[in-house]
UniProtKB/Swiss-Prot annotation:
Catalytic activity: UMP + diphosphate = 5-phospho-alpha-D-ribose 1-diphosphate + uracil
Alphabetical keyword list: Allosteric enzyme, Glycosyltransferase, GTP-binding, Nucleotide-binding, Transferase
Secretion signal span: none
SUPFAM superfamilies found in the cross-reference section: PRTase-like
Disulfide cysteine pairs (residue numbers): none
Role this protein plays: Catalyzes the conversion of uracil and 5-phospho-alpha-D-ribose 1-diphosphate (PRPP) to UMP and diphosphate.
EC number(s) given by UniProt: 2.4.2.9
Family label: Belongs to the UPRTase family.
Lineage: Eukaryota, Viridiplantae, Streptophyta, Embryophyta, Tracheophyta
CC cofactor: Mg(2+)
Top-level lineage group: Eukaryota
Keyword Glycoprotein found: no
Protein name, entry field: Uracil phosphoribosyltransferase
Residues that coordinate or bind 5-phospho-alpha-D-ribose 1-diphosphate: R92, R117, D145, P146, M147, L148, A149, T150, G151, G152, T153, D216
Length: 224
């Protein structure tokens, strides 16, 4: 039965909102309009650390063996550093959410991707692309974008990653807040994708901002 459920889940996108009290705490700090910039950025970083931990559960490549402890021989498991894991923060707000990625996943490579959104048309435009021409075979990729609102930015990012040889099932998305328009687009276009969110909000306004959301994550993270 477990194998059957796993096969079924591979055909559809899954969204996870981990019920951890610290995740709820940091989301609440981010929501508060009175939270000053340094504390906002720290809260975003701490939220990213927790979501990165959850997203990497049962997903990282493992090697097993035996080692000699001071008291005897022990069976052990290590994360296999030979299997590539990549972090792709979407600039600029993704930098704060991905800040502690290396403390959770020390053997990763980080590829920056800059995508801006036209304030009138809400269409994405790529202004910086540091992705490799092709990801190494078997790469696992975590895309970090704090706000999944209309979905244009995250869809553009995943399209670029897939063009470089990564399958949907090898991509995970981390966000602080997700909303229905973005999640619907991701579900329709990328079956098998997994999304990890701090919280899900009900709607997006006509300017493309999540309601109630937390405002402009980039502006509030960097004070500009």
């Amino acid at each position: 039965m477990a194998a059957q459920n796993k096969a079924m889940s591979g055909n559809r996108m899954l969204v996870f909102v981990p019920p951890h009290p610290l995740i709820k705490h940091w989301v609440s700090v981010l929501r508060n309009e009175q939270t000053p910039c340094p504390i906002f950025r720290n809260a975003m970083s701490e939220l990213g650390r927790l979501l990165m931990y959850e997203a990497s559960r049962d997903w990282l490549p493992i090697i097993t063996g035996e080692i000699q402890s001071p008291m005897g021989v022990a069976s052990v498991e290590f994360v296999d550093p030979r299997e590539p894991v990549a972090i792709v923060p979407i600039l600029r707000a993704g930098l704060a959410l991905a800040e502690h990625a290396s403390s959770i996943l020390p053997a990763t490579k980080t590829y920056h991707l800059g995508i801006s959104r036209n304030e009138e048309t809400l269409q994405p435009s790529v202004y910086l692309n540091k992705l490799p021409d092709k990801f190494p075979e078997g790469s696992r990729v975590i895309v970090v974008d704090p706000m999944l609102a209309t979905g244009g930015t995250i869809v553009a990012a995943i399209d670029l990653i897939k063009e470089r040889g990564v399958d949907n099932s090898q991509i995970k998305v981390i966000c602080a807040v997700g909303a229905p328009p973005a999640l619907q687009k991701l579900s329709e276009k990328f079956p098998g994708l997994h999304v990890y969110a701090g919280i899900l909000d009900p709607t997006v306004n006509d300017k493309g901002f999540i309601i109630p959301g937390l405002g402009d994550a980039g502006d509030r993270s960097f004070g500009t």
